[in-house]
Regions:
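Extracellular glycan-binding segments that recognize GlcNAc-based cell-wall polysaccharides
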Residues: 1-194
Length: 194
């Protein structure tokens, strides 16, 4: 049962591919909203039930259509009923008043889109590898408490979209989560000197 936080907003991310959900953590903390998971082409029953029971008005989707399809977005926007066998359950979701999508061509670009939307003036940025989830999972909670975005990077190279984000931001403090096996010294130096 949901008793605290923002009762009208949820973040929706792929439960099949973790990076967008990790990038969305800071936004969820800022919004005081949960992250619900979905499949690319269908909404799991537990997510449908949450949307219907909570009567969500705003849904923020992490990732473009290759992560979460237009069909899922349409169901979120227009609503749905939940069937139990041959009967319609009392849980009917009338659709969101607002559906917002935050995504880019890949996980790195998506992290910058979410960062710019969530904390556009943050002077702190948290970096974590986009290649596995443990460090980024820790980074999301830390970033949310510091009102900072999480940017995902490669182990051995700094994506150009991250360089561009760094150049156009007012970053005064960086936090890199993970050791050299997650983010190489080379990338760490690029982040420091960007």
């Amino acid at each position: 049962m949901r008793e605290k936080g923002n009762t009208k907003v949820v973040e929706l991310a792929s439960g099949e591919n973790y990076p967008d959900a990790l990038s969305m953590t800071s936004m969820a903390i800022k919004d005081k909203a949960p992250i619900l998971l979905t499949k690319k082409d269908s909404i799991p029953m537990y997510t449908k039930k949450a949307l219907a029971e909570w009567d969500i008005e705003t849904v923020k989707i992490a990732g473009l259509h290759k992560a979460i399809s237009k069909e899922v977005e349409k169901q979120i926007d227009e609503g749905f009923s939940i069937a139990k066998g041959n009967k319609i359950d009392s849980n009917i979701y009338d659709g969101a008043l607002s559906v917002l999508r935050y995504g880019g061509a890949n996980r790195y670009e998506t992290s910058t889109v979410i960062a710019a939307a969530t904390h556009p003036k943050s002077s702190i940025v948290v970096y974590a590898t986009g290649e596995n989830f443990p460090d980024a999972l820790v980074a999301g909670n830390y970033a949310g408490r510091k009102k900072a975005p999480v940017l995902l990077v490669n182990r051995d190279s700094l994506p150009s979209v991250i360089k561009e984000y760094n150049e156009n931001s007012n970053i005064r403090k960086i936090v890199v989560i993970g050791g050299v096996n997650a983010i190489s010294d080379y990338v760490f130096d690029l982040i420091l000197n960007d």
